[in-house]
């Protein structure tokens, strides 16, 4: 175990086995801290599953993995369905019982190829994830990680409906090192896997109790007025200066004025701060990958940097 920031300990374990993919790593950590669900889109072989498994092992969390397909049945996701016959006064009574498993008993679940799930199963699945309940009974799930291949024709993949995609607060794009031309990191991967043993057991670094303690801290973490104003300015800038509207983006009040506050706080905790700072506005990169047009998303660092600079310059002017 460790007395250091528990989330940095989890990051260390991911870094030991996976080179690069910083956006995915930070997204997973923000999801664990905030207990919000995560959507990752990227081609096969970009460490999506491996990173989720590393976090669950290092944090001693019960992990469930399932690869969805066109014939996925709900029972495959929630446990075994037992059907029995019992005699009754009016004849034979047929009863069904669910022996809980899958997402009903896991603390982290990874739902691979979620967009391939049939509509009926997907709707029930998303309702369970949203409510974190099954027949009014709470489930222990901290965060669900849904993955999908890019929706290009060659992957024979259909995109999630925007309303369904919006249920995943954290959204990130995973890219391979080769096509991303990250040649230095590619060489590091080759070196790492040339030297590491074939079998490697991820050590236990964090307990569920520690994660619970930090989640309690999350709600009380201060968001100063200047950070609140910066968030409002961020949304206003996207709409007023970049022409975003209902037809070209998905900027919901729920996501940007409620859920975004949890992500700001989670980002502050990840960086060992006891209150949010203007720099935590960069966490908005992890909720906007599929809510904004690609060309606007690519400018996000610049947009956020400008907003932070304006706030800091205003503060300096007022102090004079």
Where are these regions (language model features)?
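Conserved C-terminal "switch" segment of AAA+ ATPases
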Residues: 3, 17-18, 172-246, 273
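Pre-Walker A (pre-P-loop) alpha-helix and adjacent loop at the N terminus of AAA/AAA+ ATPase modules
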Residues: 4-43
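Conserved Walker
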Residues: 19, 41-43, 65-67, 89-100, ...
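Short loop/turn elements that form and flank the Walker-type P-loop nucleotide-binding site
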Residues: 26, 33-35, 59, 103-105, ...
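Conserved alpha-helical scaffold flanking the Walker A/P-loop in AAA+ ATPase domains
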Residues: 27-30, 83-109
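Walker A/P-loop
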Residues: 29-71
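C-terminal engagement/docking regions of AAA+ P-loop ATPases
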Residues: 47, 240-320
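Canonical AAA+ ATPase core
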Residues: 84-89, 108, 113-124, 130-206, ...
């Amino acid at each position: 175990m460790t007395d250091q920031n528990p989330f940095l300990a989890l990051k260390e374990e991911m870094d030991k086995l996976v080179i690069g993919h910083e956006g995915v790593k930070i997204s997973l950590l923000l999801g664990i801290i905030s207990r919000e669900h995560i959507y990752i889109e990227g081609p096969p072989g970009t460490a999506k599953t491996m990173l989720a498994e590393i976090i669950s092992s290092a944090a001693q969390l019960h992990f469930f993995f399932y690869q969805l397909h066109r014939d996925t049945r709900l029972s495959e996701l929630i446990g075994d369905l037992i059907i029995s016959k019992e005699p009754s006064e009016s004849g034979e009574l047929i009863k069904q019982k669910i022996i809980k498993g899958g997402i009903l008993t896991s603390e982290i679940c990874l739902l691979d190829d979620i967009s391939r799930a049939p509509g009926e199963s997907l709707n029930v699945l998303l309702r369970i994830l949203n409510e974190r309940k099954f027949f009014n009974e709470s489930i222990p799930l901290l965060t669900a990680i849904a993955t999908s291949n890019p929706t290009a024709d060659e992957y024979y993949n259909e995109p999630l409906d925007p309303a369904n995609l919006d249920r995943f607060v954290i959204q990130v794009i995973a890219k391979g090192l080769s096509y991303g031309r990250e040649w230095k990191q590619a060489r590091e991967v080759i070196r790492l896997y040339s030297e590491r043993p074939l079998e490697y057991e991820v050590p236990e670094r964090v307990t569920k109790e520690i994660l619970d303690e930090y989640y309690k801290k999350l709600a009380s973490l201060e968001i100063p007025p200047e950070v609140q104003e910066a968030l409002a300015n961020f949304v206003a800038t996207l709409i007023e200066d970049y022409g975003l509207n209902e037809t070209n983006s998905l900027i919901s009040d729920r996501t940007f004025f409620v859920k975004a506050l949890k992500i700001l706080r989670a980002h502050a905790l990840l960086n060992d701060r006891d209150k949010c700072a203007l720099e935590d506005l960069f966490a908005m990169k992890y909720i906007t990958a599929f809510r904004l047009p690609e060309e606007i998303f690519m400018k996000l660092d610049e947009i956020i940097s400008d907003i932070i600079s304006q706030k800091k310059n205003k503060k300096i002017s007022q102090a004079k």
